UniProtKB/Swiss-Prot annotation:
Protein topology in the membrane: Multi-pass membrane protein
Location of the region described as Disordered in the Swiss-Prot/TrEMBL record: 269-347, 652-685
Top-level EC class: transferase
Similarity comment: Belongs to the glycosyltransferase 39 family.
Subcellular compartments: Cell membrane
PANTHER family, per database record: MANNOSYLTRANSFERASE YKCB-RELATED, UNDECAPRENYL PHOSPHATE-ALPHA-4-AMINO-4-DEOXY-L-ARABINOSE ARABINOSYL TRANSFERASE
UniProt name for this protein: Putative mannosyltransferase YycA
Domain of life: Bacteria
GO molecular function terms listed in the Swiss-Prot or TrEMBL record: pentosyltransferase activity
Pfam families, alphabetized: PMT_2 (PF13231), YkcB_C (PF24878)
Phylogenetic placement of the source organism: Bacteria, Bacillati, Bacillota, Bacilli, Bacillales
Principal location: membrane
Record field: transmembrane: 6-26, 68-88, 109-129, 154-174, 176-196, 204-224, 363-383, 399-419, 422-442, 455-475, 479-499, 513-533, 573-593
Protein keywords: Cell membrane, Glycosyltransferase, Membrane, Transferase, Transmembrane, Transmembrane helix
Amino acid sequence: MKTKRFDAALILILLAAAFLNTYHIWQDDTANQYYLAAVKSMTQSFHNFFYASFDPSGFVTVDKPPVVLWIQTIFALIFGVHTWSVIIPQALAGVGSVFLLYRMVKPTFGVGAARIAALVMALTPIAVAVSRTNNIDSMLVFTLLLGSTCLLRAVKQGKLVWLLTAFALIGLAFNMKMMQAFMVLPAFVLFYLIASRVSLKKKIGSLLLSLVLLTGLSLSWAIAVDSASSSSRPYVGSSQTNSVLELAFGYNGTERLFGQTTGLAKGDMNAAGGGNMQNQDNMQAPNGNGSSFSQNGNQSFGNHSQAPQPPNGQTGALNGGGGTPPTGGNGPGNGGPGGGGGKSVNMFGTGDPGPLRLFQSALSGQISWMLPFSLIGLLGAIISWYRDRRGHAAKMKETLFWAAWLVPVAGFFSIAGFFHQYYLIMLAPPIAALSGIGWYTMHRLYKNNKDWSSYLLPAAVLITAVFQVYILSAYTSQIGSVWMYVLGLLGLGITLALLMLKRSHPFSKLLTIISLCVLLLTPVYWSATPLLYGGNSVLPESGPQLKGSANGGNMFSSEVDSGLLSYLRKHNTGEEYLFATLTTVTAAPYIIYENESVMAMGGFNGTDPILTVSELKKLIKEGKVKYFLLSENNSGNSELVSWIKKNGKEITSDEYSGSSSSTNSVQGMRRGPGGESQQTLYLVE
């Protein structure tokens, strides 16, 4: 009986992926507080768990569906609410994606192509950066790859159950990140139509049934929430009508393409007109002794570091990574997990819309290192199929699946008006797969042909190396120019070797492997930068701009003011909420670290129309809340803010600042979408 042997190279690749995704996360005290607060709240009741409530009292939800947060909450219930316990699921998903890609490529293209695909996936910088956070996208990609695996099996085995499972997994993915999950639908439908061996009538019938299942699963949670009485559930965060369906197809749908048009506040983001934002680089991050809380007895968060000053006195508008932006110019602006935006499409450091957007310095370092190689490899696959259609039919169909994933997604990000850099992880699987497939096809053309097609491999190596040098040229202020010149010389040298030793078969395969190693040198370093320098938990990114950034200079997080906390606890007379504030940024640390219920009256960035003045009056009259912590530069929910200031008694910071040392680096200051601003406490009875 023939036994299956483990692929030692795959084991090493998986270990490398696990190392990049997990190393030091147990010592990392930073996480996306928006989601971490939700997980903490979701551990406290099934009501909060089902609705993905941001706060313990179930006032407002986060702006994403709950499936990934459900997984994180289960881990938190088992291991306690730590940063590492909510990051581990995404780290494991990142490793799982590498394995699934290997398993998908190997049967058709061989072990060599599968190894390369897995390695490129493991070394994709943005994939590593996202997998080291509690953001949702790594789990989303894993789920879509799992669905892709089922789709391939459906075609090969001809069984409807695998097709239904594949589309059901897209429906599950919709309940992770909404419309982003549907980006792979064209690839799924096209591949089944061209690759399945059943009749056209049966193909259409099977696809229609699968799409019905997909639709039902996708909308199941949204319909369940929207059908519930608004008084019996939390408000749907970042929606304007308290509807999950509106959130899915508006804020998390069309606005991602055309630019954010809802939930904007002039004082917070100054975004609608693309105006200037407050510089965040000179803002100090919290550096107190950290706050502890008990979930299963001994959970704690460690010390928080100080955000860096930009080198050479340079500044960057809302530089999410801290440190110096590429080329020493103005850093990209960033938005939070649920907000920020406007129609200024360059606000989030995503470059200028256009067909070459993925090749611009703003995005290329995150995802595009192997993009030229994969595109030229796709050309090689098409040439091989054209010359031998019968022999390469199956290979071409699978190649088209990855191309149909790559092209629409790349096209979307080339023109989209509202997204963050870490969304580009959606491009990691097709680029990695086409890199492996491209190596397979171009090496065969290189070895077996004497015409122009045999030069595709040397051309791919040279063009990709030149492009990587171009990417590096934007970072000379961080890493110098030596790396750029060394890579250029190595790329030129290996290209010349491929040309001169083309007919020396004993060396040809070794040369192609060496050429790939050269092309992966810089992605290895880029992928390691979150480990080396600390990443940004809210807006993950990789690159040397993180150097010296101390936990990413995370602007969308804040700390507990222990003096304020002591004062509010002392004067609480049974109110359900310790205090109310406008944004989740201010509320989150009190929920996470202190087990307190804090009301975020305006959702993530303070602009959600959750309460009217009369509804707020009712809450105050019922004794549910009486203290309000407001920021001076908040213009969201202006009616509420004006009413509170007019009818409330201002509590000066002198009354609570001396009662206990504050863990904030700046007394009474607020950080977040509106930058740094003075906060004032009001009492309304």
